[in-house]
Amino acid sequence: MIELLLKEGYIDILNIDIKPPRENKHSQYWRQCDILDLGALKKEIQAFNPELVVHLAAKTGLTRARLDCYAENMVGVRNMFEALKLAPAVQRAIFTSSLLVCQMGYIPKHDTDYKPSTFYGESKMIGEKIVREQKDLNFSWTIIRPISIWGPWGEEPYINLFRSIKQGWYFHIGGGHYRRSLGYVENAVFSIYKLLRAPLEKVSGKTFYIADYEPADLYDMANEIGAQLKARRIFHLPLMPIKVLAAIGDFLRGRGWENVPLQSFRLKNILTEYVFDMSPLKEVVGPQPFTLKEGIARTIKWLKLNQQL
């Protein structure tokens, strides 16, 4: 996000995070702050007095055993509102939620049609409700729900996908071509920026999914990655033995192994198709800058430059 803002000519940028930026040249814009520390957050926001805000901070992961493990997604959102109310220059704020406010495979009928199946998803649902309950604000808000963002600077699971294809041990599960809405990271950042700059009446109080406009066929995507990496052909594994391995993973997780590589929940996510209507985003944002093939090429280039492939 900072890289795009710099290219667009912005110089007054503040990045609040508990961790330093992974890109060293962005360190000058970083202030260490925990969004759960309301006093510190108010101090930073008041001092900077921003006009445009993108709230990305979150506690992620699906394995935590209690809702309160995701306080950043609930208390953190409320704290951000309390801090922004003290900054008179604020005009707009974008709050980042998740597609997991609904279980995988469920396409909601409207913005508040919630159906979470994990504590993480529930925490994001609560975060959205905190946004929607705000009254008498001097700035507008927008909610975004990113969908499976991948690309440079990414981590699991998509970076591991590139590595496994390169090393020749990736197998496609089952015989089907699973179609999914996915978001290449530079397209996602571009879309968020465009939402910040869009006419107010098109974005105020609205919810947008963030992804590429066209869904990806996961098998075709894997083949394209393999072709660009000059890797071996990708083969299919029958579904039944994979289900057995997932059941073993369930057993191991029940015995205390939290990060089991494969379990039934993860297998279901792999096999579930979800394609979202991206026309509301496209109507506001317009054409996105990169195709799927270009995104793959740019990701491979970044991985090689950073010695991660």
Q: Predicted regions: what is each one?
A:
Residues N79-F119, T142:
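Conserved Rossmann-fold NAD(P)-dependent oxidoreductase catalytic core, especially the SDR/UDP-sugar
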Residues S117-R145:
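Active-site Tyr-X1-5-Lys
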Residues V185, N223, L245-Q288:
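Conserved C-terminal active-site "lid" loop/helix of NAD(P)H-dependent oxidoreductases
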Residues M1-L52, G127:
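N-terminal Rossmann/SDR dinucleotide-binding element
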Residues G154-N160, G174-R197, G205-K206:
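Substrate-positioning beta->alpha
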Residues I35-E72, L86, M104-P108:
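NAD(P)H-binding glycine-rich loop region in Rossmannoid oxidoreductase-like domains
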Residues C102-Q103, F139-N160:
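Flexible, glycine-rich beta-alpha linker
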Residues A198-P261, K293-I300, L309:
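Mid/C-terminal beta-alpha module of Rossmann-like enzyme folds, strongest
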